[in-house]
């Protein structure tokens, strides 16, 4: 476990999780526990040693947004019995402890939610993510909002907006969203992605999606052509040109004149 900038977290041995209260018996099964207090963003990599599979180690990469009054723990837990009964698992579950990460927020967590990005990878199929960062909405009164920027190694950058109330508007660097969830990507190799999740508005300087009722809309540019998948009628604006689209049950070519 490191800070997102690569600095060592300097985790220290702890027994703190063992005394979490009589109602949290599961903590008693954790061992090799270590803790660090930090308000910085954290990057964690869980790695399963795959010596018996040509050394193609399996990793789960985790990026978590930092918050004040937060502690992070690493630990080992007993093997996961349920997973051990699933055929075709990539490693022997019963012979491996479960790699464990715990984040604890002191004080009010509603306005300081746990925000994380997970990405699996192997040595032969390495991580596709270059960097993960987090941003706040420009609306000062918007508290229960999470903003994530994911930069991929292929040149794609995704800005992810998450709100608990889809009637609220979140703005960041010319992007405006009114939805529970939204993804806005840059253009890379003639491709681009916009997703509006249970919302009515997604606006960028050159592309926008508007609906009269909350809807799910996926707008994609593939090799220069635009495709749409929408649960409700919507108005699409691309480079100043408006296009009306009805409900589509599968990805449909959008006629942009």
Predicted feature locations:
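Trp/Gly-enriched beta-strand surface patches
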Residues: 4-96
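Non-catalytic terminal regions with compositionally biased, polar/charged low complexity
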Residues: 9, 19-21, 37, 99-112, ...
